[in-house]
Regions:
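Short acidic/polar hinge/loop motifs at secondary-structure boundaries
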Residues: 117-145
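Face-selective signature of the C-terminal outer-membrane beta-barrel domain
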Residues: 254-269, 291-464, 475, 534-540, ...
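Extracytoplasmic beta-strand/coil segments of soluble accessory domains associated
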Residues: 31, 42, 74, 78-117, ...
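Conserved C-terminal beta-signal and adjacent last beta-strands/turns
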Residues: 193, 249-251, 269, 288, ...
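Short, acidic, small-residue-rich periplasmic hinge/interaction motif at the N-terminus
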Residues: 24-66, 74
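Gram-negative outer-membrane beta-barrel transporters
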Residues: 445-451, 540-544, 562-639, 675, ...
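Outer-membrane beta-barrel signature, preferentially recognizing the C-terminal barrel domain
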Residues: 288-302, 427-433, 490-545, 552-578, ...
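Periplasmic-side early beta-strands and strand-to-turn transitions of outer-membrane beta-barrels
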Residues: 150, 162, 170-171, 179, ...
């Protein structure tokens, strides 16, 4: 913990020194407005100043991303107040975006958008498997916290993250960028833009990232260790390192003119490591091949001074091919008469080549919507939207265990896999989902100082029927430098296909009678522009979530159930301070308390306190320095977990860059986890030492513009 304190002291001392050295400049009038850089569409569907928006909005620009030395999306999102990125204990250390204490291992409570279009997988309702997103194609990221289903429908539950890509209309120089870093990591980017005088043209970007992962992320014990102790075998790969290698490709092609735009985005993570293993048994042979392709056609037209229309048509394809060694070669596993591990009436079975599963799925999704905006009524903006979604989901599976393959009476078993595709023994049968929706919203500027936003959205799903979610926002601006907000919203989270229809899976089966999760959020916000260079934002919130879906033991079988209620409250404080034209400071502090209202237990694995402080300093001769510190507080354990509270940590990143403008060249050195903090993210008791995060890494970056 002394490193955490030391990191913050370094930042504060550094800031003080720079403030004194630049005092003459700081006292001058700064030709900079924080508000001018921060406009957003995420809160209301049309462009407006963030501080006037009916929501709690954070905006991270491409310039912010470039200065902080981040290489993937998770590092950027960690800077948002109230948002903490964990690693999933259930799903191969995939990112979990915990917002205000709301989270689960598959990340379905946060809606992720790409240019305003969702790209979740219907299997889990979270991001595509092993999702890791490079950053150079991103123009800005907009985040709204709180219930937002009145605008965005399902899964806009704890918040919405909209990733907005660069496009023809943005001034983007052609670049080639190469980064080399620790753990045999390499990132390569090339981008190019062509446009005519009318603004028509194209933008193309391709990014490729590879890494072998940090081999020092060691876990001393896993589930196979426990099985070895009980069965007398020695099959566990622990102590061993987490399997965190990746090979990510992201390609974007944007073609547009003044009214049409066509965005095509391809993303792939090929041969990705399986983290701690899908059964929490280390797996050095398993991998995930995950890919996503999205084609989005948009038409936007201002009809006249009062009316505007926007229509969108999107096709999204997802594909996931997996090879999992649930338990390693030579493991002796109790197999029930249904062929699954650990089910009742079992016999020990020796798996010579390991317990192997190779599930695959692909999903096709079509989304269409039309939005109409009308400002013909005095002091009002009316917005209405109608649309539909159609999803088809197809599965296949090969394995050497489970129903239709084993009955627990034959031993040993080798690595030959049985194809159960199309049979009743597959993990999930093919599915389809249909959803139609209608939304309406009115923003009424009924007084020069007051704006009232009222809206709602009706959704109808083929599985569970209709649901309606309202919103209400009152914005008060008594002075040009102060804004107050009262916000209320409701949201729902649709059950995923796995929660509804999973079968032949010892870790949990679905329940077709599941209801959507529901939430109500209340919030008070004060946004104060203390000076042209200093902005303070404070928010206090309360929420109540119902019908949360959990995997519960029903008889002798784990099954997904609407089994929990949760309440939470908290405080978020954010400051943005431009001390001079050379020096900028950002900081935030968040506190949250959330608990299960049925049991009174504090929600585990979520820090109550988090903080962030960053410094950007543009020095003489085109040198620049960025230093940031994340402070993550301690996290409580589950009531049945006898381990000590998980300690907090501080994570510091330093970037030093030098521009050679006459040569269109920039070089940089980036150091992540600057103080080599022993940072850990929570695990289940099966892996008692928690999951270590990456140690210190050093990167060299070179960018050429032309």
């Amino acid at each position: 913990m002394h490193k955490a304190i030391y990191g913050f002291i370094v930042s504060l001392v550094f800031t003080s020194a720079l403030s004194f050295s630049d005092a003459g400049v700081a006292d001058e009038e700064v030709d900079y407005s924080l508000e001018s850089a921060y406009f957003s569409t995420i809160a209301s569907g049309h462009l407006e100043a963030v501080r006037k928006a009916p929501g709690v909005v954070s905006v991270i620009t491409a310039a912010d991303i470039a200065s902080m030395g981040a290489t993937h999306l998770d590092e950027v999102l960690e800077t948002v107040p109230g948002l903490h990125v964990l690693r999933s204990d259930l799903s191969r250390l995939e990112p979990v975006y915990s917002i205000r204490g709301l989270q689960s291992g598959f990340n379905p409570q946060v809606l992720i958008l790409f240019n305003g279009v969702e790209f979740k997988t219907p299997f889990s309702e979270g991001t595509p498997p092993m999702f890791r997103l490079p950053l150079n194609m991103i123009e800005r990221i907009e985040v709204i916290k709180g219930a937002s289903s009145a605008l965005y429908g399902a899964n806009a539950y704890s918040g919405v993250i909209n990733i907005i890509s660069k496009r023809v209309g943005d001034y983007i120089p052609a670049i080639v960028q190469v980064k080399n870093g620790s753990f045999h990591s390499r990132d390569i980017t090339t981008q190019h833009r062509e446009a005519n005088d009318e603004g028509a043209g194209f933008f193309f970007s391709i990014e490729h990232q590879t890494s072998a992962g940090d081999s020092k992320r060691i876990v001393d014990q896993d589930l196979q260790t426990i099985i070895d102790q009980q069965s007398g075998t020695r099959s566990s790969l622990a102590a061993g390192d987490l399997n965190t290698d990746y090979s990510v490709t992201s390609m974007l092609l944007n073609v547009e003119n003044d009214v049409w735009s066509w965005n095509n985005w391809f993303w792939e993570n090929k041969g990705a490591g399986t983290g701690q293993g899908v059964a929490r048994a280390l797996d050095n042979d398993g991998y995930v091949d995950s890919s996503s392709y999205m084609s989005h056609l948009q038409y936007k037209q201002i009809i006249d001074f009062e009316r505007a229309i926007e229509s969108n048509l999107t096709y999204h394809y997802l594909d996931s091919k997996n090879y999992f060694k649930l338990f390693p070669s030579g493991s002796l596993i109790p197999i029930g008469n249904d062929g699954n591990p650990f089910t009742p009436i079992n016999n020990p079975v020796l798996f010579e080549d390991g317990v192997i599963g190779a599930p695959e799925y692909n999903a096709h999704k079509v989304i269409a919507d039309v939005t109409y905006q009308y400002i013909g009524f005095e002091d009002q903006i009316w917005r209405s939207q109608f649309g539909f979604q159609y999803t088809s989901f197809e599965t296949s599976e090969r394995k050497n265990y489970g129903p239709g393959v084993l009955d627990g009476t034959v031993s040993p078993i080798n690595g030959d896999l049985t194809d159960v595709t199309g049979l009743p023994y597959v993990f999930l049968e093919d599915q389809k989902r249909r959803n139609v929706f209608f939304a309406v919203q009115n923003q009424w500027y009924f007084h020069p100082d007051w704006t009232l936003t009222v809206g709602g959205r009706w959704d109808r799903y083929s599985e569970f029927g209709s649901i309606f979610n309202p919103r209400l926002g009152l914005v008060w601006e008594p002075r040009h430098d102060f804004t107050g907000k009262l916000l209320y919203g409701e949201a729902f989270r649709a059950p995923s296909f796995s929660e509804l229809y999973m079968k032949n899976n010892p870790s949990g089966i679905g329940s077709a009678s599941l209801l959507p999760e529901r939430i109500k959020t209340y919030e008070i916000v004060a946004d104060y522009q203390v000076a042209p260079s200093l902005r303070l934002i404070n928010s206090v919130y309360f929420y109540k979530a119902e019908d949360l879906i959990e995997n519960k033991l029903v008889g002798s079988v784990y099954q997904f159930q609407n089994a929990a209620q949760q309440e939470g409250y908290g405080l978020e404080i954010e400051a943005q301070w431009v001390l001079s034209s050379q020096l900028k400071l950002k900081g935030q502090y968040s506190y949250q308390h959330s608990e299960n209202t049925d049991t009174g237990e504090v929600i585990a694995d979520v820090p109550n306190h988090t903080g962030y402080l960053s410094i950007d300093y543009k020095m003489l001769n085109d040198w620049a320095l960025h230093l940031n510190n994340h402070w993550i507080g301690s996290s409580a354990r589950e009531r049945t977990d006898t381990r000590n509270t998980l300690s907090g940590y501080a994570w510091s990143t330093l970037k030093v860059s030098k521009a050679f403008e006459q040569h269109n060249l920039e070089t940089a050195v980036i150091v992540k986890n600057l103080f080599d903090e022993n940072a850990r993210t929570p695990s289940s008791p099966i892996i008692p030492g928690d999951y270590p995060l990456e140690g210190r890494s050093i990167w060299a970056e070179i960018t050429y513009s032309f």
